UniProtKB/Swiss-Prot annotation:
This protein's UniProt keywords: Glycoprotein, Glycosyltransferase, Golgi apparatus, Inflammatory response, Membrane, Signal-anchor, Transferase, Transmembrane, Transmembrane helix
Catalytic activity from the UniProt record: a beta-D-galactosyl-(1->4)-N-acetyl-beta-D-glucosaminyl derivative + GDP-beta-L-fucose = a beta-D-galactosyl-(1->4)-[alpha-L-fucosyl-(1->3)]-N-acetyl-beta-D-glucosaminyl derivative + GDP + H(+); an N-acetyl-alpha-neuraminyl-(2->3)-beta-D-galactosyl-(1->4)-N-acetyl-beta-D-glucosaminyl derivative + GDP-beta-L-fucose = an alpha-Neu5Ac-(2->3)-beta-D-Gal-(1->4)-[alpha-L-Fuc-(1->3)]-beta-D-GlcNAc derivative + GDP + H(+); an alpha-Neu5Ac-(2->3)-beta-D-Gal-(1->4)-beta-D-GlcNAc-(1->3)-beta-D-Gal-(1->4)-beta-D-GlcNAc derivative + GDP-beta-L-fucose = an alpha-Neu5Ac-(2->3)-beta-D-Gal-(1->4)-beta-D-GlcNAc-(1->3)-beta-D-Gal-(1->4)-[alpha-L-Fuc-(1->3)]-beta-D-GlcNAc derivative + GDP + H(+); an alpha-Neu5Ac-(2->3)-beta-D-Gal-(1->4)-beta-D-GlcNAc6S derivative + GDP-beta-L-fucose = an alpha-Neu5Ac-(2->3)-beta-D-Gal-(1->4)-[alpha-L-Fuc-(1->3)]-beta-D-GlcNAc6S derivative + GDP + H(+)
InterPro entries: Glyco_tran_10_C, Glyco_tran_10_N, Glyco_trans_10, GT10-like_C_sf
Protein name: Alpha-(1,3)-fucosyltransferase 4
Signal peptide coordinates: none
Family matches, as Pfam families: Glyco_tran_10_N, Glyco_transf_10
Length: 398
């Protein structure tokens, strides 16, 4: 499959054509121009070429992800200002359900109790008299459930969007979701209806041979390997591999649990920037599951990522092959350690892992504002096209 990060154009130049070939070249160019013109005339107009603004779209976020028990609601983002997406009217108030063209459902909140889906597919909250002693997630949960129970049938044309950024290994309750409830999927999977990766590379506007920050100053890199891990589990492949690797090379561990040193999130990038390598080890291995561990923790910090996740081919759909080191490239943890030590002694070879920065820069997705706005944009582009997801679990767990 074609890489999604793109490639630079071929370099121009070369010897001139002999005179005898000029006529043939002119004829070829003329026929090519006609073909291109015909193809271009058959293309639909580009979104930004339309003089009319996109139609306003109302998008309701049914649960605010990871809001917490006592945290106040965050105001919806300004999609125009943040992401240059106009025509979006975003809501967290369920009173807007009837007018919403799309409703976003975050999977983790979807499957944990108490259930309060909108009708008619959702299992509603029990009556008030049956809810004594029920533990609410926050003070507003009960009021929201009562609002849900008062809602009418699903409005015609309304799209339900299943949103999830966890891997199948950490997405319980998938089998309990009936088919054809949702119209669209929104996730890190490239085959989602709304593809929202944790990050991506984009071409620099003005590529140069030495853009600022191309190669972080090696003098600042006082450590060799760093790893930030939030949930320590000895059963995970990433912990088992760390146990092997740390026998041959020093790995400084940060985060909660295990041997890690506490590290505030605000200090993560600054801390990792002092290391040459970063273990971008995912908590599970699944198709396209490449998280902020690569995009923010490694790339933004200016460390070379050592990845453990999907296979190398999957990574190369999104980043150049020389931008990372994959554990699968080595027969053992000891051979990987030897390679890292070799790169530590050879700065010229090490700098080769930063060559891609000459042409591309890193974008890290802004959760949860960016997916919300992208869902709005998807509704605008889809028009009246209809679809549903017949087997959500079967698709996501493949």
């Amino acid at each position: 499959m074609r890489a999604r990060w793109g490639r630079r154009g071929a370099r121009r130049g070369g010897p001139g054509l002999p005179g005898t070939h000029l006529a043939l070249l002119a004829a070829s160019l003329l026929s090519s121009s006609v073909a291109i013109y015909v193809c271009w005339k058959q293309l639909p107009p580009l979104p930004w070429a339309s003089p009319s603004p996109p139609r306003p779209v109302n998008v309701l976020l049914w649960w605010e992800p990871f809001r917490g028990r006592h945290n106040p609601r965050r105001p919806p983002p300004d999609c125009q200002r943040r992401f240059n997406i106009s025509g979006c009217v975003l809501h967290t108030d369920r009173a807007a359900y009837e007018e919403a063209q799309a409703v976003l459902f975050h999977h983790r909140d979807l499957v944990k109790g108490p259930p309060d889906w909108p009708p008619p597919w959702g299992v509603q909250m029990p009556p008030v008299e049956e809810r004594e002693g029920l533990v609410m997630d926050d003070e507003g949960q009960e009021a929201e459930a009562e609002t849900s129970a008062a809602l009418g049938p699903r409005p015609a044309g309304q799209r339900w969007v299943w949103m999830n950024f966890e891997s199948p290994s950490h997405s319980p309750g998938l089998q309990g979701l009936a088919g054809n409830i949702f119209n669209w999927t929104l996730s890190y999977r490239a085959d989602s209806d709304i593809f929202v990766p944790y990050g991506y590379l984009y071409p620099r506007t003005h590529p140069s041979e030495q853009p600022p920050g191309l190669v972080p100053p090696l003098a600042r890199k006082q450590g060799l390997v760093a790893w930030v891990v939030s949930n320590w589990d000895e059963r995970q492949a990433r912990v088992r591999y760390y146990r092997q690797l740390s026998q041959y090379v020093t790995v400084d561990v940060f985060g909660k649990g295990g041997p890690g040193q506490p590290l505030p999130d605000a200090e993560l990038v600054h801390t990792v920037a002092r290391y040459k390598f970063y273990l971008a080890f995912e908590n599970s291995q699944h198709l396209d599951y490449i998280t902020e561990k690569l995009w923010r923790n490694a790339f933004l910090a200016g460390a070379v990522p050592v990845v453990l996740g999907p296979n190398r081919t999957n990574y190369e759909r999104f980043v150049p092959s020389n931008a990372f080191i994959h554990v699968d490239d080595f027969p053992s943890a000891s051979s990987l350690a030897a390679h890292l030590q070799f790169l530590d002694r050879n700065p010229t070879v090490y700098r080769g892992y930063f060559r891609w920065r000459r042409s591309h820069a890193v974008h890290v997705t802004s959760f949860w504002d960016e997916p919300w706005c992208l869902a709005c944009q998807a509704v605008q582009k889809a028009g009246n096209q209809r679809k549903s997801v017949p087997n959500l679990a079967g698709w996501f767990q493949q």
